[in-house]
Amino acid sequence: MRVHVADHPLVAHKLTVLRDERTDSPTFRRLTEELVTLLAYEATRDIAVEPREITTPVTTTVGVHLRSPRPMVVPILRAGLGMLEGMTRLLPTAEVGFLGLQRDEETLEAITYANRLPDDLSGRQCFVLDPMLATGGTLVASIEYLFLRGARHVTAICLLAAPEGLRTVEDAVGDRADVTIVTAAVDERLNERGYIVPGLGDAGDRLYGVV
C-alpha cells in the first residue's frame, strides 16, 4: 500500500478553510470540489495510457491517450458525492459507479446499503472518493468489493486521514502495490466517537446539512 500526502500550499489553504467551523455549506462544497481536483492530479500520476499517433497543424507526432478500459470513479454515498465534480473535472471520460457504505455508530463497522457498479471490473483502475478516512472500515470494505469484481488497481482519494484508519487499511491489504491512498493531510488521532481530530467535523453534514 502506498500513501501520498499532497504537500502544496493551495491544498493546505483550502483545507484550512474547510476545517473552519464558520465555513458555510456552499463554500464548503465549492472548496471540496477544488481540493479534490488538486488531489486528483496526484492520484492520476500512474493512470494507464498508451501511445497514439496524431497530426498537428505542423506535422505528425506520437502522444498518449487513456488506455481502455476507462477508469472507474466510485464515490461512497453520501459524502463522496461532494467530491465527484472535482474528480470528473480532471477525468471527464471516466465512468462513474456508486457504492453505498455507512458506518454503524455503535460498532463503527461498515454496512453496505447500495451498489450501482458493473459486476465485472476486470482490468479497471478504480478511484474511490471518500472524504474522511477515519476508522478505515468503509475504505477496506470498498477496496475488497472492487477487487472481488476484478479491479486492477484501487486509489482512494480522501480529504483527511487518521493514523488509525491508515493502519486498518494497511493491515487489510498488506504490502500489495495495487492500493494507493491520496490525502490532503494525516491528522492526529480519532476521538472516542471515531471522529478525526482536529478534523473538519462530519463531511456529509457540512456538505449537505444535517439529515
From Swiss-Prot:
It holds the Pfam family UPRTase. Its EC number is 2.4.2.9. GO terms for biological process: UMP salvage; uracil salvage. Binds 1 Mg(2+) ion per subunit. The magnesium is bound as Mg-PRPP. It is an enzyme of class 2 (transferase). GO terms for molecular function: GTP binding; magnesium ion binding; uracil phosphoribosyltransferase activity. Its cofactor is Mg(2+). It catalyses: UMP + diphosphate = 5-phospho-alpha-D-ribose 1-diphosphate + uracil. 5-phospho-alpha-D-ribose 1-diphosphate binds at R78, R103, D130, P131, M132, L133, A134, T135, G136, G137, T138, D202. Pathway: Pyrimidine metabolism; UMP biosynthesis via salvage pathway; UMP from uracil: step 1/1. The keyword Magnesium applies. Uracil binds at I196, G201, D202, A203. It comes from the Bacteria. CDD domains: PRTases_typeI (cd06223). Keywords: Allosteric enzyme, Glycosyltransferase, GTP-binding, Magnesium, Nucleotide-binding, Transferase. Allosterically activated by GTP. Belongs to the UPRTase family. HAMAP family: Upp_B. Catalyzes the conversion of uracil and 5-phospho-alpha-D-ribose 1-diphosphate (PRPP) to UMP and diphosphate. This is Uracil phosphoribosyltransferase.
